[in-house]
UniProtKB/Swiss-Prot annotation:
Residues 15-302 form the Protein kinase domain. This is Protein kinase YegI. Transmembrane segments: none annotated. The gene is yegI. Its EC number is 2.7.-.-. The active site is at residue 143. Autophosphorylated. Dephosphorylated by PphC. Probable serine/threonine kinase.
Length: 648
C-alpha cells in the first residue's frame, strides 16, 4: 500500500515515499517513486543532531566503491526543505537474502541446492572485500553480525545497516555503540556496554574471520564444540572470552574440541588454517588478526586451487586433498551438498568391466621377498650380572637346602647339630635373594625380546604390504570385492526403489520437518547464542532434533532439551501424510542418482586399482628398499635379544 508521504532531499528535491517494505525498532524502509533503484529509511523519531551530522557526512562522501558493497546513504531526507534529517536514501537491495540462507546447510539445501563449496568460497571472499572497502575509507563496521549481510545468487554481498557503522568524519568519530555478543571479540566480551567505546579494524577482523568460518564450515561457530574441561561449553560468550577455539591446533589445552561429524579444518591449506588460528587466539589480540585485504588475497588464491570429485560435481574441494571430504562426510550421514543427479561426472562412458577385470587377472605377482632374518646373525649373548646364578644353579641350591632340612629333622635336634641351623638360614637367604634378582633379570630380557620381535614383525608386515605377495593378494581381493559390488548394483537399485513404499510416510514427515528452522523459531530459553551452539552440532531444523543430539550440546540440560523436544512435537502435530504423493518422481530420481554415483565411484576406484595392481611388481623394489635397512637392524636387534635371553 502506497503512503504518498512527501519528503525532501538535502538539495531540496521533492520525493514521494511509496509502499512500506519493512519496519524495525529504529525506523521503516520505503520505496521511492522517483528513484526506483533506491529506497528510503525513515526514522520513527528524528535522530539526535550528532547522528544527523554523521548521515550528512556519509551521504556527502558516498562513492562507487562504497555503493558497490554497502547500502550506503546517497542523500539525507528531510521533512521540509532545510529541515532536520529524518532519514536517508540508499541503494535498493533486491534479489538477495540474509547470509545465513547460504551458510546454513539446511537453508541452502532448500533455497540454493545448486550452490557448491566453490560458490561459498566466493561469497566468503566478497564478505572480506566489503570489509576491505569500509576499512580503506577509514571507517569500522563495528556491529558485525550475520544479519548485516545480504547475498545474491551471483555471490555478490551487500552490507546493510550502514548508519550504525563507526564513521571517521575528518577526525570526528561517530561511534558504533551496539554489538552482538557471539560476534564480539574476546578482548571486548567483558565490556558492560559499547557506549563511548572506540572500535578498531582489528575488532572488525574478528567478526570477519567468524563470518568466513561460518560460510566455509556449514554455519558452525569456532568457539562451540565438545567440552574437554568442566567449565567449558556453558556459555558461548565465556568460551570466546577464554579463547576456547575448538579447532585450534592446541585445542586440548583450550578445553574444547570440534563437534562430532563437523568439517575438518585440515580441509583448508595450512596457510589459511593459520589465518583462523591467528584470528581466534591470543596472538590476534597481541599482534593483530588477518586483515580484510589478506583474506581477499588468500581466498582468491584458494579459488584457483580447487578440484571436483569424480563422483559428484557438487563436491568441490581444495586440490591439496587426496580424498573428497564431502564423500567422507556423506558416508557418515552428514549431507552438506545435494547431488541432483544430472550433474554427476561420469568416468567417460568407456568403462568396460570385462576389460578392466582382464587387467586385474593379467597382473603378475611379485617374487618372494628376500628379507633379513634373525637367524642370519650370530651374536654373543650378554652374560648374567656378576654374582647372579643361572637358573639351574638356583634349582640345585634349593634341592640342597631341602635335603639338609630333612637331614636336620632326622637327627632329632641333637645339640651338636644345632650349629647347622644358621647355616641353613644363610643358604636360604642367599638362595631367596639370588632367585629374586634372577627373575627380575629374566623379566627384563624377555620384555626386550618381545619388543624387538614386535618391531621386527611390524616391519615385515609393512614390507609385505607395499611390495610382497601378501600386499598383492590383499589388493586383488579388494578389487574383486569392488567387481562384485558393481555386478550387484542393479539388484541393489531394485531393492532401494521397492523400499520407497515402506519409507514413504517417514520421508514425507522428514521433508516436512526440514521446513521448520530453529534460527527463526521461538523456543523458551533458547536465544541466539544457544541457537548458534545447536547449529554447530548440526541441529538446524525440527528434523535434526533428537533428545540425545540436543543433550550432547553443553548447556542444554533436561529443561532446555525438553523445550526443544516440545517445539519439535508442535511441528510434528501439523504433519498430514499424503498417500497420493507417497512416491514422487524426485524420490525415484534420488535413488537412481545415488546408485549412479556409487557406480561411478566403484568404476573409477576399480580402474585405478587395476592399473596399480599391474604396476605392483614393477614398483615393489622402490617401495621396499627404504624399509630394508630398518628391517636388517630390527632383525639384528631381535637376534641379540634372543641370545641375551638364552643366557638365563
Amino acid at each position: 500500500m502506497k503512503t504518498n508521504i512527501k519528503v525532501f532531499t538535502s538539495t531540496g528535491e521533492l520525493t514521494t515515499l511509496g509502499r512500506e517494505l519493512g519496519k524495525g525498532g529504529e525506523g521503516a524502509v520505503y520505496d521511492i517513486e522517483e528513484f526506483v533503484d533506491s529506497v528510503a529509511k525513515i526514522y520513527h523519531t528524528p535522530p539526535p543532531a550528532l547522528k544527523q551530522d554523521k548521515l550528512a557526512f556519509m551521504a556527502a562522501t558516498a562513492d562507487a566503491q562504497l555503493l558497490n558493497y554497502v547500502a550506503w546513504p546517497q542523500a539525507t531526507l528531510h521533512g521540509g526543505r532545510g529541515g532536520k534529517v529524518i532519514g536517508f536514501m540508499m541503494p535498493k537491495v533486491s534479489g538477495k537474502e540474509p547470509i545465513h540462507m547460504i551458510y546454513s546447510p539446511a537453508h541452502r539445501r532448500q533455497s540454493y541446492p545448486h550452490c557448491a563449496w566453490d560458490f561459498l568460497l566466493y561469497v566468503a571472499r566478497n564478505i572480506a572485500s566489503s570489509f576491505a572497502t569500509v576499512h580503506e575509507h577509514g571507517h569500522v563496521v563495528g556491529d558485525v553480525n550475520q544479519n548485516s549481510f545480504m547475498v545474491g545468487r551471483d555471490s555478490k554481498v551487500v552490507l546493510i545497516d550502514s548508519d550504525s557503522f563507526q564513521i571517521n568524519a575528518n577526525g570526528t568519530l561517530h561511534l558504533c555503540e551496539v554489538g552482538v555478543s557471539h560476534f564480539t571479540p574476546p578482548e571486548l566480551q567483558t565490556l558492560p556496554s559499547f557506549v563511548g567505546f572506540e572500535r578498531t579494524e582489528n575488532h572488525d577482523n574478528f567478526g570477519l574471520a567468524l563470518l568466513i568460518f561460518h560460510v566455509l564450515f556449514g554455519g558452525r561457530h569456532p568457539y562451540s564444540g565438545v567440552p574437554l574441561i568442566s567449565d567449558a561449553g556453558n556459555a558461548l560468550e565465556t568460551d570466546i572470552t577464554h579463547f576456547r577455539y575448538a579447532y585450534a591446533s592446541d585445542n586440548q589445552r583450550r578445553g574444547l574440541k570440534p563437534p562430532p561429524r563437523s568439517i575438518p579444518l585440515s580441509m583448508l591449506p595450512s596457510d589459511v588454517e593459520a589465518m583462523f588460528q591467528q584470528a581466534f587466539t591470543e596472538s590476534g589480540v597481541a599482534t593483530g588478526r588477518p586483515t580484510a585485504k589478506a583474506w581477499v588475497a588468500a581466498l582468491d588464491s584458494l579459488r584457483q586451487q580447487l578440484k571436483k570429485c569424480i563422483v559428484s560435481a557438487m563436491h568441490v574441494y581444495p586440490a591439496h586433498l587426496t580424498d573428497c571430504p564431502w564423500c567422507a562426510l556423506d558416508n557418515q550421514g552428514v549431507i552438506y551438498f545435494i547431488d541432483l543427479g544430472e550433474e554427476v561426472i561420469t568416468t567417460g562412458g568407456n568403462f568396460v568391466l570385462a576389460k578392466v577385470w582382464a587387467m586385474v587377472m593379467a597382473s603378475v605377482a611379485p617374487p618372494a621377498l628376500q628379507l633379513p632374518l634373525p637367524d642370519h646373525f650370530q651374536p654373543t649373548g650378554r652374560p648374567l650380572p656378576l654374582g647372579l646364578l643361572r637358573r639351574e644353579y638356583i634349582i640345585l641350591l634349593e634341592i640342597a637346602l631341602s635335603a639338609l632340612s630333612l637331614l636336620l629333622c632326622g637327627l632329632q635336634a641333637e645339640p651338636r647339630y644345632i650349629i647347622l641351623v644358621p647355616v641353613l638360614a644363610a643358604i636360604w637367604i642367599i638362595g631367596s635373594l639370588t632367585s629374586k634378582a634372577y627373575k627380575a633379570e629374566v623379566q627384563q630380557r624377555r620384555e626386550a625380546f618381545n619388543r624387538a620381535k614386535m618391531d621386527y614383525d611390524h616391519l615385515v608386515r609393512q614390507i609385505q604390504q607395499v611390495g610382497g605377495l601378501e600386499g598383492f593378494i590383499a589388493k586383488r581381493t579388494m578389487l574383486e570385492k569392488m567387481k562384485d559390488e558393481i555386478l550387484g548394483l542393479p539388484e541393489e537399485e531394485k531393492r532401494a526403489l521397492a523400499a520407497l513404499h515402506d519409507t514413504a510416510r517417514e520421508r514425507q514427515k522428514q521433508k516436512f520437518l526440514e521446513g521448520f528452522f530453529i534460527d527463526v523459531a521461538s523456543i523458551p530459553g533458547v536465544g541466539p547464542a544457544r541457537k548458534a551452539a545447536l547449529r554447530s552440532f548440526g541441529i538446524e531444523t525440527a528434523a535434526d532434533v533428537t533428545r540425545r543430539g540436543v543433550k550432547q550440546v553443553k548447556g542444554f540440560g533436561d529443561h532446555l532439551t525438553q523445550a526443544v523436544i516440545d517445539w519439535k512435537a508442535s511441528c510434528e502435530r501439523r504433519f498430514v501424510f499424503r498417500p497420493n504423493e507417497a512416491i514422487t518422481p524426485a524420490d525415484r530420481q534420488a535413488v537412481m542418482a545415488k546408485m549412479t554415483a556409487k557406480r561411478h565411484r566403484l568404476e573409477s576406484a576399480l580402474t585405478v586399482g587395476a592399473t596399480e595392481l599391474q604396476r605392483f611388481r614393477l614398483h615393489a623394489p622402490a617401495r621396499t628398499m627404504p624399509l630394508m635397512e630398518p628391517l636388517r637392524q630390527a632383525a639384528e636387534k631381535l637376534a641379540q635379544a634372543q641370545a641375551d635371553l638364552s643366557r638365563c
